Amino acid sequence: MEDSDKENTLLLPNNKYRNQNFIRNQDEDENENENNDNLENDNNKRNYISINNYEPYKEIDNNNNKNNNNNNIINNNNKINFYNNLIPRIKSYFQEIKPFLKYCSFSFLFSFDPSEPYLVDYFTNVLGINQTIVYQEIYPYWTYSYFVFLLIFGILGEIIGYKVIIIIGMVAKILTIGVLLSTNNIIWMILEQITEGLSYSAYTVFLAYIYFSLDTSEYQKMACRVNAGYLVGIVSSGLLGQLLVEQRLPLVYLLSIACGTNILALILALGFSNYKIDQKFSLKEVISDLFGTFKNADIVRWYIWSGIAISIHQIVITYWQNLFLQVNDEQSWNGYISASAYFFASFFAIIPSKLGNKINNIQGIILVLFGLLGGGLLVLMGFGGSTVVSALSFIIYNCCFEFVSPIVNVQIAKKLSSRIGVLFSFNIMVALTIQVLVQSAVGKQFLNLDIKTQFYYYGACLFFLSFGFAILFGFLFLKKKINSNSNSNSNVDVLIVNHNTQNQNSEEKKKKKELYYNANIIDFENNNNNNNNNNNNNNNNNNNNNNNNNNNNNNNVGIGGNDNFK
């Protein structure tokens, strides 16, 4: 018993533990079953949702991803198209502004000369040449050279091309500065003026070159822009020269800077295209073209105005420094004066390009007003007792001229159909001829006027020009008005005649209708009468036929009675 009890006591804990383990295992199995059931329920729910609702949250995410991808693709395509279109746009833009950059840059570099406002000072103070010799014996050769080479370059440009002439002119401009830097001999100074005139005559050929390289409709805009570039070059170089002079730098430095800009202009000219006339050069054709242009009254009118106005302007530009030197006996403000004159003039030079064809209706008024205003300003320059009055007069005068000059040049270019270079050069030659005559008249050969009195003379020339053109434009206006009135009267007469002829025609038509109507009535009456006569005749015939029938009947009765009687 004891052994069995021991065994039982020993077995009890094991059984207890086994029972506990069994209970635990049972609980764990139940938990696992519950978890499995929960998982199955969740899976069933998910499957139900996925089957019945097609997992919309996943579709929304997929749609958003697709939209984002599509947007990214569209953005990438837009960027690619933008960059692909950007390069052609840039190329086309540069092709459009390429002539503007080339021509305006060349004009700017050509005119960029800081030493220009101080040349008289350089001649007198640095080289030691007398002022009277400067403006009576040295400066006139610029005009002579300009005149001769205009004719030569105008003809050569059509043979060898305008580009070659422009390059020759820039080489001559560089040689001009080389002569100024190397010697003070008067003969060499005269040679320097000859090369300077040669370079400016080549610049005139450059203006004709612009006309050849562009459409006629674009020439006025480009001419105004090139003129503005020229003026900006003068303004900026004048300010630079003034600053350098105030820093007590020698004038030789200014000439060296001008030489450098001329070399840059020469390099730029080497890249120009070479335009020339396709037809062979013939002197007879050139002469015939020149005479043909003078058959056009409009061209003659513009030639006369430009000849006188340009000649006076060239003289004023050449001698204004001498005038200020006599007024103030110093040239410390010449840089500011020159820069101000051309700075404000550059804005006025652009105005005609903005107005376009609107300015054609008031051209005559503009030319007349310029003569009056410009002449008064030149007289005021000569009369001015101070540099301020003379400087203000010079600035306003220069603005007026630079405003009118592109208008005249464009009008001349529009009237010309061929040989633009020769005819442009001939226009300047007319101006230079007048300039030589004016300089000879005021010089020591004839009147021997001092510099102040010369400006009175120049102003009087513009006054006469203005009055002459006022009379001419007034005559043309009256002629046009008379012609318009005569045309209107003739139109009224024509209308009256047409009205009378229409009345006559209508009366004749009425008469014809009446005659036709009467004739129809007469014909109708005659037809009625004829019809009546015919009817009467028919009736008579019918009566005769009836009588004959009666007679025949009677005869038949008699014969029949005899038979019966028999």
Curated annotation (Swiss-Prot):
What GO cellular-component annotations does this UniProt entry give? Answer: plasma membrane
Membrane-topology annotation of the record: Multi-pass membrane protein
Arranged from A to Z, the UniProt key words for this protein are:
Coiled coil, Folate-binding, Membrane, Transmembrane, Transmembrane helix, Transport
Please name the GO terms that the record assigns under molecular function: folic acid binding; vitamin transmembrane transporter activity
Keyword Transmembrane set for record = yes
Which residue ranges run through the membrane?
A: 148-168, 171-191, 194-214, 226-246, 252-272, 304-324, 332-352, 364-384, 388-408, 420-440, 458-478
Cell compartments where the protein resides: Membrane
Region described as Disordered: 25-46, 526-566
Question: Biological process GO annotation list?
Answer: transmembrane transport
Q: Report which superkingdom the organism of origin falls in.
A: Eukaryota
Q: Classify the main location.
A: membrane
- Give the Low complexity compositional bias ranges: 526-556
Protein role: Folate transporter.
Entry similarity comment: Belongs to the reduced folate carrier (RFC) transporter (TC 2.A.48) family.
From the Swiss-Prot or TrEMBL record, give the protein name.
Answer: Folate-like transporter DDB_G0272544
